[in-house]
Amino acid sequence: MHSRLNSRAWRGAMVAAAIATGAALAVAGRAVAQQQNFDNVEIDTVKVRDNVYMLVGAGGNTTVFTGSDGIMVVDTQFAPLSTKILSAIRAISDGPIRYIVNTHVHGDHIGGNESISKAGHFRAGGNVVGDLGAAATATAAIIAHENVLKRLSADPPAGQPQVPFAAWPTETYITKKREFLFNGEAVQIIHEPDAHTDGDSLVFFRKADVLATGDLFTTVMYPFIDAANGGTIDGYINALNAIMDITVASNVNEGGTMVIPGHGRLSDEQDVTEYRNMATIVRDRIKEYVKRGMTLEQVKAKKPTLDFDPRYGSDSGIWTTSMFVETIYKQMVAANPPTKPTQSKNQPKSSGK
């Protein structure tokens, strides 16, 4: 894809993606949002295809899907940007916001859940009436994998704020895929386990042929493997392969399935292919070094990411190239522990003297 938005937006997205690591990531967006100034952040709107749009601000990219049934929002960025996000949505459509889908647990993707859900309302079935029906339809439904709810409902790390109950998913799924009809289009929400986190979802709009990936694919950094929240490099590569199974190229050129990344520019299958190849090559290099018995320092000295650093590397911030390499190294060591040398049958035993 040659389509580009301004570099300010992408730099802001990259910073937002690297807010925190470990267990604190689920609530970090809220804590950092209290310290950052979002007054100067602008929300850029990109029409992707048909009635699907991408909103770019200071957190993860937001997807907006509109139609006769209402509006579906995929990821909600940071809480302080909620008013701006809502204004951008209203510039697209004044229809009711029915659904929010969270691709994973991180604060730069769920921060606006509470405000945006309260601005919408869910259309419940006819068997939900009275006070219960009113409660059930008072806000937009928030959909995510069950593991997202488990992470959000757990006690937060010491010193971190609890994500408000109103921002938690109201509907979860535990199967590989959840699919339903909305705005006359089949929408598929697909779980990719143990990848960026343990609760990642892809959201595929079949008729429009648009896929929102969350942080299972970005264009601005190395894969963010949140090991503390269940992420693994092998699962991440599996997820990229799953994305490629869904997407279709247009005559091996630009076009075909449009891919909305968690951070970065609008993409297509070729972009995902390049990213998958990079992740696989780096993983395999480090795996080979581990098999040779190299230490972490020796692996870093080999610079296994050297040819990809100009595009994805970073020496500063929370998610650096060094941290990417170290995370893969630790997971490869855990998967391939060194074996104790076996004693030859013909080797004489020590007399102990």
Model features per residue range: what roles?
Residues 4, 26-34, 125, 249-256, ...:
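Accessory terminal helices/loops
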Residues 47, 70-71, 78-80, 134-139, 143-193, 197-198, ...:
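Metallo-beta-lactamase
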Residues 2-18:
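Bacterial N-terminal signal peptides that target proteins for export
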Residues 42-92, 201-215:
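Conserved beta-strand hairpin/beta-sheet module of binuclear metal-dependent hydrolase folds
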Residues 68-72, 80-140:
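Active-site metal-binding motif and surrounding structural segment of the metallo-beta-lactamase
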Residues 51, 65, 75, 89, ...:
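Divalent metal-coordination and catalytic microenvironments
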